[in-house]
């Protein structure tokens, strides 16, 4: 398969959108911009701090791009939670995206991971240093069960990224490997657990429903992500260990067959999600449905996924799927296509510049005060001594 399978992708996307009854009415435009601005301001201020910059060593422009992507994901999808939780989750998931894009081998920094954890010492790995410092800000919003899901899933994610450092597709015949790796680095339990803040849900009262939601969300959100990422990953050398390409190697099938496998699984998961929770507590179902619709809007509108290119490429195609896709994309763009200039400011780089200028001014001011202090005569020094 040398050319991107446009028609097949359009059909798959349309079936997904129809299955979840896509109709994102989560916000007014003003509400969306307000939440984006709030989450971005707090998260950008966090990453512009001296400690974060010194330890992460990530280019501010690259960090800014990661932050914009994650703030969009959180605000569009975690519709029912407070703005404060949106901001705290934006910081946490930006850390995960930074790790996902990293190429550093964690081996040496992980040699004493458990010993340091048990002794309450700071971790050696710089990512864990900062994630652990911020984690209490996230976990304060949740009960113990949901918190455990967030902690465990974040740990799994780190291990999954570690495995991906080797660009390993799995061995031919290792049918369990693609799903194993994707569940590990998909953050499904972290996402599934973070939909239920204690200010909105009693996790003891809704324990069974929350457990089921975490189980269903584990696959749904990663498969939708893989499906919506297929276009951008198709010919990107940095994305060669995707789930679809791992299926090709491990299952020894063609790329078309691997995409079909992902498609069937995604559609089945969507049907199960809608069916399982349709007769449950209305507040639970509303949270799940709003997440699903917002998560899809984010994929369709975020520049990272380049789906606008697919939309524009269908203008000359008059098949039923192409027409439906353009209609769905138009619906998503109407509510979700908001340029970063409307909410992502000041940027991380601008905040760093201001911080450095303030630090320099304070240092210069201190130097002036020090030089202006009168010298203590020698005789007085002897008396004081």
From Swiss-Prot:
Lyase found in the keyword field: yes
GO MF, one example: trichodiene synthase activity
EC numbers for this chain: 4.2.3.6
InterPro entries according to UniProt: Isoprenoid_synthase_dom_sf, TRI5_ascomyc, Trichodiene_synth
Taxonomic superkingdom: Eukaryota
A Pfam family: TRI5
Top-level enzyme category: lyase
The keyword Cell membrane belongs to this UniProt entry's keyword annotation: no
Gene3D superfamilies, per database record: Farnesyl Diphosphate Synthase
Pathway: Sesquiterpene biosynthesis; trichothecene biosynthesis
GO BP terms in the entry: sesquiterpenoid biosynthetic process
Family as reported in the entry's similarity comment: Belongs to the trichodiene synthase family.
Something else known: Trichothecenes are sesquiterpenoid toxins that act by inhibiting protein biosynthesis.
Protein name: Trichodiene synthase
Species, as recorded: Paramyrothecium roridum (Myrothecium leaf spot fungus)
Gene name, Swiss-Prot/TrEMBL: TRI5
């Amino acid at each position: 398969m040398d050319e991107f399978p446009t028609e097949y992708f359009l059909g798959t996307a349309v079936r997904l959108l129809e299955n979840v009854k896509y109709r994102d009415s989560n916000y007014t435009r003003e509400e969306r911009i307000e939440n984006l601005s709030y989450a971005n301001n707090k998260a950008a201020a966090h990453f512009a701090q001296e400690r974060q910059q010194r330890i992460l060593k990530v280019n501010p422009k690259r960090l800014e791009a990661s932050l914009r992507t994650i703030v969009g994901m959180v605000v569009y999808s975690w519709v029912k939670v407070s703005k404060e939780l949106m901001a705290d989750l934006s910081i946490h998931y930006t850390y995960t995206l930074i790790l996902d894009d990293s190429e550093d081998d964690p081996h040496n920094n992980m040699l004493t991971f458990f010993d340091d954890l048990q002794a309450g010492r700071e971790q050696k790995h710089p990512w864990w240093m900062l994630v652990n410092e911020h984690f209490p800000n996230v976990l304060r919003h949740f009960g113990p069960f949901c918190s455990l899901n967030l902690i465990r899933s974040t740990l799994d994610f780190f291990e999954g990224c570690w495995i991906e450092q080797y660009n390993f597709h799995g061995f031919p015949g290792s049918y369990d490997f693609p799903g194993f790796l994707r569940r590990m680095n998909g953050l499904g339990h972290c996402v599934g657990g973070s939909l239920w803040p204690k200010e909105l849900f009693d996790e003891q009262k809704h324990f069974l429903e929350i457990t089921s939601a975490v189980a269903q969300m584990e696959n749904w959100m990663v498969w939708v992500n893989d499906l919506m990422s297929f276009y951008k990953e198709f010919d990107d050398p940095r994305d060669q260990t995707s789930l679809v390409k791992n299926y090709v190697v491990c299952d020894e099938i063609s790329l078309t067959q691997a995409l079909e496998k992902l498609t069937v699984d995604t559609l089945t998961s969507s049907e199960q999600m809608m069916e399982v929770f349709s007769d449950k507590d209305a507040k639970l179902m509303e949270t799940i449905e709003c997440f699903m619709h917002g998560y899809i809007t984010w994929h369709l509108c975020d520049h990272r996924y380049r789906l606008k290119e697919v939309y524009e490429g269908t203008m000359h195609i008059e098949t039923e799927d192409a027409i439906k896709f353009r209609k769905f994309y138009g619906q998503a763009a109407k509510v979700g296509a908001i340029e970063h200039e409307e909410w992502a400011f000041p940027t991380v780089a601008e905040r760093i510049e201001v911080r450095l200028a303030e630090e320099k001014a304070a240092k210069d001011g201190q130097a002036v005060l020090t030089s202006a202090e009168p010298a203590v005569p020698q005789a007085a020094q002897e008396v004081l001594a």
